[in-house]
UniProtKB/Swiss-Prot annotation:
<dbReference type="Pfam" id="PF00411">
    <property type="entry name" value="Ribosomal_S11"/>
</dbReference>
<comment type="similarity">
    <text>Belongs to the universal ribosomal protein uS11 family.</text>
</comment>
<keyword id="KW-0689">Ribosomal protein</keyword>
<comment type="subunit">
    <text>Part of the 30S ribosomal subunit. Interacts with proteins S7 and S18. Binds to IF-3.</text>
</comment>
<dbReference type="GO" id="GO:1990904">
    <property type="term" value="C:ribonucleoprotein complex"/>
</dbReference>
<dbReference type="GO" id="GO:0005840">
    <property type="term" value="C:ribosome"/>
</dbReference>
<dbReference type="GO" id="GO:0003735">
    <property type="term" value="F:structural constituent of ribosome"/>
</dbReference>
<comment type="function">
    <text>Located on the platform of the 30S subunit, it bridges several disparate RNA helices of the 16S rRNA. Forms part of the Shine-Dalgarno cleft in the 70S ribosome.</text>
</comment>
<dbReference type="GO" id="GO:0006412">
    <property type="term" value="P:translation"/>
</dbReference>
<dbReference type="InterPro" id="IPR001971">
    <property type="entry name" value="Ribosomal_uS11"/>
</dbReference>
<dbReference type="GO" id="GO:0019843">
    <property type="term" value="F:rRNA binding"/>
</dbReference>
<keyword id="KW-0694">RNA-binding</keyword>
<dbReference type="InterPro" id="IPR036967">
    <property type="entry name" value="Ribosomal_uS11_sf"/>
</dbReference>
<dbReference type="InterPro" id="IPR018102">
    <property type="entry name" value="Ribosomal_uS11_CS"/>
</dbReference>
<dbReference type="InterPro" id="IPR019981">
    <property type="entry name" value="Ribosomal_uS11_bac-type"/>
</dbReference>
<protein>
    <recommendedName>
        <fullName>Small ribosomal subunit protein uS11</fullName>
    </recommendedName>
</protein>
<keyword id="KW-0687">Ribonucleoprotein</keyword>
Length: 130
């Protein structure tokens, strides 16, 4: 019987990126932190739901802090040293996510608010009656 042919596989080389972009999407229900390179290719991401928080605890500043820390530690493997932070959304985890990325050890070059603001676009949802 013939021996099975062994395939030679090359180890995937991780590219080294020195500066990246951290996209923080802070909604009222969740916070998503994505770290990309300058071209927009994702290096790592984390959400407050994926960090183990469920329900109303997902929308807390502490959950955003944990998610940003998780995404930041994963991006350290690529050699990222400095970050530009782009914040989108009105959620409660905006500032704590940026503070957490700073505590991980990144040099934050600038912080940009890219929240989309309509110039009288779509009709907003009806007001809540509690």
């Amino acid at each position: 019987m013939a021996k099975p042919v062994e395939k030679k596989t090359k180890k995937k080389i991780k590219r080294v990126i020195t500066d990246g972009v951290a996209h923080v999407h802070a909604s009222f229900n969740n916070t998503i932190v994505t770290i990309t390179d300058r071209q927009g290719n994702a290096l790592s991401w984390a959400t407050s739901g994926g960090a183990g928080f469920r329900g109303s605890r997902k929308s807390t500043p502490f959950a955003a802090q944990v998610a940003a820390e998780k995404a930041g530690r994963a991006a350290l493997d690529y050699g990222v040293k400095s970050l530009e932070v782009r914040i989108k959304g009105p959620g409660p985890g905006r500032e704590s996510a940026v503070r957490s990325l700073n505590n991980v050890g990144y040099k934050i070059t600038n912080i940009i608010d890219v929240t989309p603001i309509p110039h009288n676009g779509c009709r907003p949802p009806k007001k809540r009656r509690v």
